[in-house]
Amino acid sequence: MVKVYAPASIGNVSVGFDVLGAAVSPVDGSLLGDCVSVEAADLFSLRNEGRFVSKLPDNPKENIVYQCWELFCQEIGKTVPVAMTLEKNMPIGSGLGSSACSVVAGLMAMNEFCGKPLDDTRLLTLMGELEGRISGSVHYDNVAPCFLGGVQLMLEENGIISQPVPSFDDWLWVMAYPGIKVSTAEARAILPAQYRRQDCISHGRYLAGFIHACHTGQAALAAKLMKDVIAEPYRTKLLPGFAAARQAAEDIGALACGISGSGPTLFSVCNDMTSAQRLADWLRDNYLQNDEGFVHICRLDTTGARQLG
């Protein structure tokens, strides 16, 4: 049997709309992500389990892990009968790369089980294709960090899909999921079709400056440049309590705060555990809206998807 874990990810990381993503894992060692296991069988089957199993589609063929199996078999040119199990630990529509977790774990588990017939670039291409079926357009800002780990910058040139960006080991990423759902398609539809020239210039300056600061080890500058002029000004109306949470993060001393992916999860960067814990407590008391919500203090997951056991 092969079992693969794929970690949560932050799409956009505020400053890089659709071109930047970061994988994260809780500091307490718990798994914030999905697991998919594959074992030999006479016929294909898919079993679902985990905390968020009730959110999955009733029709197995609509399950993204079934589609992983189907696409993988098409790609290698033969049908591989396997029993697959999806452990759905990630809420759907959370802004934590939930679909990416299932896609990455599903395709990587099949590839490992079959003796790695596909290389990482081909596998990542298929992951982007499947992710596109869900969100409506191919983008890699969740699947790339989820699969490869760390902070990834999407390039999509010269046969290169993404490359890693140097990161800051002492940063703590406080992740708060309020327990409500925001559809990626809805969150994209709310964005303007055209942007003001000044916003385009600011976006270019922030993103270029952030990447430069990461490569030159300037943590304070990198954090200061984590600003979103593309999505956040429009998406905050979908996120009750976000403005108050951002203010609380600033008051507590967080270095940066933003929307993870299309929301509703909020992320905040702190450089000491005391501030991170204070902010986590505040978010738990004030940002969560129901029992499905959670807060985790994380670090970057520099490994990405991996086999367990």
Curated annotation (Swiss-Prot):
Keyword entries, A-Z: Amino-acid biosynthesis, ATP-binding, Cytoplasm, Kinase, Nucleotide-binding, Threonine biosynthesis, Transferase
Enzyme class name: transferase
Binding-site positions, ATP: 91-101
Pathway terms, separated by semicolons: Amino-acid biosynthesis; L-threonine biosynthesis; L-threonine from L-aspartate: step 4/5
UniProt KW Amino-acid biosynthesis keyword: yes
GO function terms (MF aspect): ATP binding; homoserine kinase activity
Annotated localization: Cytoplasm
A GO CC term attached to the entry: cytoplasm
Pfam families: GHMP_kinases_C, GHMP_kinases_N
A Gene Ontology biological process term: threonine biosynthetic process
Transmembrane regions listed in the UniProt entry: none
Annotated catalysed reactions: L-homoserine + ATP = O-phospho-L-homoserine + ADP + H(+)
Function: Catalyzes the ATP-dependent phosphorylation of L-homoserine to L-homoserine phosphate.
Name of the protein described by the UniProt record: Homoserine kinase
Gene name, Swiss-Prot/TrEMBL: thrB
